[in-house]
UniProtKB/Swiss-Prot annotation:
It catalyses: an aldehyde + NAD(+) + H2O = a carboxylate + NADH + 2 H(+); a long-chain fatty aldehyde + NAD(+) + H2O = a long-chain fatty acid + NADH + 2 H(+); a medium-chain fatty aldehyde + NAD(+) + H2O = a medium-chain fatty acid + NADH + 2 H(+); hexadecanoate + NADH + 2 H(+) = hexadecanal + NAD(+) + H2O. The active site is at residues 223, 257. GO terms for molecular function: aldehyde dehydrogenase (NAD+) activity; long-chain fatty aldehyde dehydrogenase (NAD+) activity; medium-chain fatty aldehyde dehydrogenase (NAD+) activity. Pfam families: Aldedh (PF00171). Geranylgeranylation is important for localization to lipid droplets and enzyme activity. A lipid is attached at residue 476 (S-geranylgeranyl cysteine). It comes from Mus musculus (Mouse). Belongs to the aldehyde dehydrogenase family. It is an enzyme of class 1 (oxidoreductase). The modification Cysteine methyl ester is found at residue 476. Oxidizes medium and long chain fatty aldehydes in lipid droplets into non-toxic fatty acids. The gene is Aldh3b2. One of its GO terms (cellular component) is lipid droplet. Its EC number is 1.2.1.3, 1.2.1.48. This is Aldehyde dehydrogenase family 3 member B2.
Length: 479
């Protein structure tokens, strides 16, 4: 289960409006979003939205998932501001036609790739990072020149309210719209034809979205989840590993799609790692983590009940406490976990960390490779060869050696899954490229027709030899 798994009652809000969608498409067809000046103005307005409503967004995130101001700043607002700034600085460069080399046959022509907006795009965001996972794709869609329909998650209802009420005040409402509702409203929205769909959520819901997109042959990006492995080598300092793993496992109460979902290590390392994890948890959240302002809460009762059920897997080595009234689950470590148990069959998406023992690096790699490809994979070792072996012999959306998801702070690196964890990528220029159609263009002179005679029938050995030489491939049969 992942970010877009729903189950709450639909929030009150507007369903898909034919008139709104028609108006947005008309605005795009009129070319309103194409000029650089328009895109720049909208990006600047988006930056102002983040700056002027920072406290409102922080309050909403605190109410929804108990995020501290630090977590809201680091994982939501600052990253969004960075993306806006990067797009503003590089927009003209990104938009430029990209010249490509020609062969002898097209030597006197102009060949280039033009980046064009797709048109009307739909962005569906989840509840776990409801600002980040809506605004960062939006930056790319605006920069690429699209009109956009935004669908925030109804589960993070306080953040949804801020986004729905305030964001439209900063953007051109003839080109951008926020639509509200739950699963049924989203289903209705997906019945309409869009030119691109960007979805973040679970593989289960991702398949539903992809099926809907297929009816219109709509291209799509799916940012999904999965069970992210974390391998810990015997030569590691257990306290260093514990500090880093505990921080990015329990960040946002474990409700992070790139968080480590389980640890693979030897029995010997497990015996050293468990007390080190206890030290880290106490250091980060105190003797009673329930009173810590730095530990979030589970999003709703449905997810709380699901996570409570997973506490019965294996043996609780650390934590295990819960409080339904507060939707609190303590930072928990499970040991003696079997691969067949429920905690190893679904994405946990909570502050629970199972430890699974393996006898070797090879066994760990085999364990990982017989499962679905994860969104992220982590390896800790003092031996670079071990980290490189894990990198070279596995497949995942992203990879971290001796650290967690700090790579997400680098817009020069793409975020995206592979296989069951998704398709497509974004962040930085990757977002611009995702929301742009790369159009192949060749412009030739209308004159000098005599030069074209060699490609016209009737064909003979001389034509064939010259054409093969001119296009640089004797095996080519296109001309």
């Amino acid at each position: 289960m992942s970010a877009a798994e729903t189950g709450s009652e639909p929030s009150q809000g507007a369903g898909p409006s034919e008139a709104t969608l028609h108006s947005l498409r008309e605005a795009f067809n009129a070319g309103r979003t194409r000029p650089t000046e328009f895109r720049t103005a909208q990006l600047r307005s988006l930056g102002r939205f983040l700056q002027e409503n920072k406290e409102l967004l922080q309050d909403a995130l605190a109410k929804d998932v108990g995020k501290s101001g630090f977590e809201s700043d680091m994982s939501e607002i600052i990253l969004c501001e960075n993306e806006v700034d990067l797009a503003l600085k590089n927009l003209q460069t990104w938009m430029k036609d990209e010249p490509v080399s020609t062969n002898l046959l097209t030597k006197l022509s102009s060949a280039f790739i033009r980046k064009e907006p797709f048109g009307l795009v739909l962005i569906i965001a989840p509840w776990n990072y409801p600002v980040n996972l809506m605004i960062i794709p939006l930056v790319g869609a605006i920069a690429a020149g699209n009109c956009v329909v935004l669908k925030p998650s109804e589960i993070s209802k306080n953040t949804e309210k801020v986004l729905a009420e305030l964001l439209p005040q900063y953007l051109d409402q003839s080109c951008f719209a926020v639509m509200l509702g739950g699963p049924e409203e989203t289903r209705q929205l997906l019945e309409h034809k869009f030119d691109y769909i960007f979805f973040t959520g679970s593989p289960r819901v991702g398949k539903i979205v992809m099926t809907a997109a297929a009816k219109h042959l709509t291209p799509i990006t799916l940012e999904l989840g999965g069970k992210n492995p974390c391998y810990v080598d015997d030569n590691c300092d257990p306290q260093t590993v514990a500090n880093r793993v505990a921080w990015f496992r329990y960040f946002n109460a474990g409700q992070t799609c790139v968080a480590p979902d389980y640890i693979l290590c030897s029995q010997e390392m497990q015996e050293r790692l468990v007390p080190a994890l206890q030290n880290s948890i106490t250091r980060f959240y105190g003797d009673n983590p329930q009173t810590s302002p730095n530990l979030g809460r589970i999003i709703n009762q449905k997810h709380f009940k699901r996570l409570q059920g997973l506490l019965g897997c294996g043996r609780v080595a650390i934590g295990g406490q819960s409080d339904e009234g507060e939707r609190y689950i303590a930072p928990t470590v499970l040991v003696d976990v079997q691969e067949t148990e429920p905690v190893m069959q679904e994405e946990i998406f909570g502050p629970i960390l199972p430890l699974v023992t393996v006898r070797s690096l090879d066994e760990a790699i085999e364990f990982i490779n017989r499962r679905e490809k994860p969104l992220a994979l982590y390896a800790f070792s003092n031996n670079n060869q071990v980290v490189n072996q894990m990198l070279e012999r596995t497949s995942s959306g992203g990879f971290g050696g001796n650290d967690g998801f700090l790579y997400l702070t680098l817009p020069a690196l793409p975020l995206g899954g592979v296989g069951n964890s998704g398709m497509g990528r974004y962040h930085g220029k990757f977002s611009f490229d995702t929301f742009s159609h790369h159009r192949a263009c060749l412009l030739r002179s209308p004159g000098m027709e005599k030069l074209n005679d060699l490609r016209y029938p009737p064909y003979g050995p001389w034509n064939q030899q010259l054409i093969s030489w001119a296009i640089g491939s004797r095996s080519c049969t296109l001309l």
